[in-house]
């Protein structure tokens, strides 16, 4: 099962930003199974899209027979990684961080196989070893291996020191030592030979390689995946300023699906290589097919379907597709209670109204019309639909028949603008 060209495959997908000693790492991977890890600090109660590429990279290694370890930073999450951050992170209390650790553990489990023999995935928490090290031992046994001069020359630290509005605290400055020790500890106790992470972690990874060599006298490797950018230069992983989370309670499967569906043509084929396991030849064939097709490209649908199912499962994908189809046609009658809940969460604007409200008032309250007179004009011009049906009566008052599931009514102005009424 061990692949002798995994590094080459990752490069072809654009998944390698930096790698230490690529030739020797490739040779080591060819020789047999290795253990590798990627760390995820609990800086929130959910992972977001930025975590997805390294997480899926672990899966790519596991699929060819290597053993992945998820390291949840129960200790490092209490400190905060300063890497390329403009200012000091807010320190979260221990109870909060421990709650986030548990949520992240639950979140990563579906991505890897924890029951596949000798390459089963495992999850570790660095709080388990740091909680047993006192400060004197750490400074004597670990700190002595670090040069402050070299630490200050790390690009992430240099950027912080160059800012006049914020420096860097000793707390965050010491983060590099903690992450480095993680690598040395995992190498000694779990035979880990490779750390992967985002390209912003390069300085921390190379420090860990150096410390592991000093403490354990073993050769280990580092590999970073690129930080994802969009072709137009805008930030990846956000929509209208809001982070796209992996937790369905923070970003609904519908909104998650829409994010990928709205991927620009300039990005979509690259994202298929980065985020899916579709064969590269199949992706190239899809691109050629889309170029020849006069209709809308299919790549966005393939991308949205693949990743939504991967993160939210078949039910999450089905719900996202059902909601999308209902909004496209303007007919919400096939939607379920949980579908309306997703729309209310973050899908479209909502307005809560009392019984027997007028349509004109609802349109103004929903900001689909700036005034009652404009609402009247929109109704008379056939621009307003109620649950998919044109409503032409300017003085229309909602009835119980307009309430889907006895609670919801979908308003639409034109083809693009929606609002969900939730009846009180």
Curated annotation (Swiss-Prot):
Reaction catalysed by this enzyme: tRNA(Tyr) + L-tyrosine + ATP = L-tyrosyl-tRNA(Tyr) + AMP + diphosphate + H(+)
Biological processes annotated in GO: tyrosyl-tRNA aminoacylation
Broad enzyme group: ligase
Source organism superkingdom: Bacteria
This enzyme's EC code(s): 6.1.1.1
Keyword Repeat (UniProt): no
Residue positions of motif 'KMSKS' region: 235-239
Motif segment ('HIGH' region): 42-51
Keywords of this entry: Aminoacyl-tRNA synthetase, ATP-binding, Cytoplasm, Ligase, Nucleotide-binding, Protein biosynthesis, RNA-binding
PANTHER family: TYROSINE--TRNA LIGASE, MITOCHONDRIAL, TYROSYL-TRNA SYNTHETASE
Family: Belongs to the class-I aminoacyl-tRNA synthetase family. TyrS type 1 subfamily.
Protein name, as recorded: Tyrosine--tRNA ligase
Biological classification of the source: Bacteria, Pseudomonadati, Pseudomonadota, Gammaproteobacteria, Enterobacterales
Gene: tyrS
């Amino acid at each position: 099962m061990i692949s002798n060209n995994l590094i080459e495959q990752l490069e072809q997908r654009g998944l390698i930003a930096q790698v230490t000693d690529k030739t020797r790492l490739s040779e080591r991977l060819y020789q047999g199974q290795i253990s590798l890890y990627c760390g995820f600090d609990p800086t929130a109660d959910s992972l977001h899209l930025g975590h997805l590429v390294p997480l899926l990279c672990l899966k790519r290694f596991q699929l060819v027979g290597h053993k992945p370890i998820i390291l949840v930073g129960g200790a490092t999450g209490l400190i905060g990684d300063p890497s390329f951050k403009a200012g000091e992170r807010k320190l979260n209390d221990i109870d909060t961080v421990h709650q986030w650790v548990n949520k992240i553990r639950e979140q990563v489990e579906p991505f890897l196989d924890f029951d596949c023999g000798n390459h089963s995935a495992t999850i570790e928490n660095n709080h388990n070893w740091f909680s047993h090290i006192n400060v004197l031992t750490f400074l004597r046994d670990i700190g002595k291996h670090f040069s402050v001069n070299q630490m200050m020359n790390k690009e992430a630290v240099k950027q912080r020191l160059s800012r006049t509005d914020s420096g860097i605290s000793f707390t965050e400055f010491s983060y590099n030592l903690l992450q480095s020790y993680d690598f040395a500890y995992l190498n000694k106790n779990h035979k880990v030979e490779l750390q992967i992470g985002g390209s912003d972690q390069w300085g921390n990874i190379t420090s860990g390689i150096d410390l592991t060599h000093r403490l354990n006298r073993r050769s280990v490797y580092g590999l970073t995946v690129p930080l994802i950018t969009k072709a137009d230069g805008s930030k990846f992983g956000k929509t209208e300023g809001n982070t796209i989370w992996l937790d369905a309670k923070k970003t609904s499967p519908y909104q998650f699906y829409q994010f990928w569906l709205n991927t620009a043509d300039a990005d979509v084929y690259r994202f298929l290589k980065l985020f899916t396991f579709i064969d590269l030849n199949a992706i190239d064939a899809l691109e050629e097919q889309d170029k020849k097709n006069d209709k809308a490209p299919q790549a966005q649908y393939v991308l949205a379907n693949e990743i939504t199912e991967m993160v939210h499962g078949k039910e999450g994908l089905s719900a996202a597709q059902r909601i999308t189809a209902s909004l496209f046609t303007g007919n919400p009658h096939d939607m379920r209670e949980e579908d309306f809940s997703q729309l209310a969460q973050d899908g479209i604007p909502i307005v809560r109204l009392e019984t027997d409200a007028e349509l004109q008032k609802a349109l103004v309250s929903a900001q689909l019309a700036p005034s009652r007179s404009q609402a009247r004009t929109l109704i008379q011009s056939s621009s307003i639909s109620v649950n998919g049906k044109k409503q032409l009566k300017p003085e229309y008052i909602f009835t119980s028949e307009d309430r889907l599931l006895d609670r919801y009514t979908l308003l639409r102005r034109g083809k693009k603008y929606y609002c969900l009424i939730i009846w009180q």
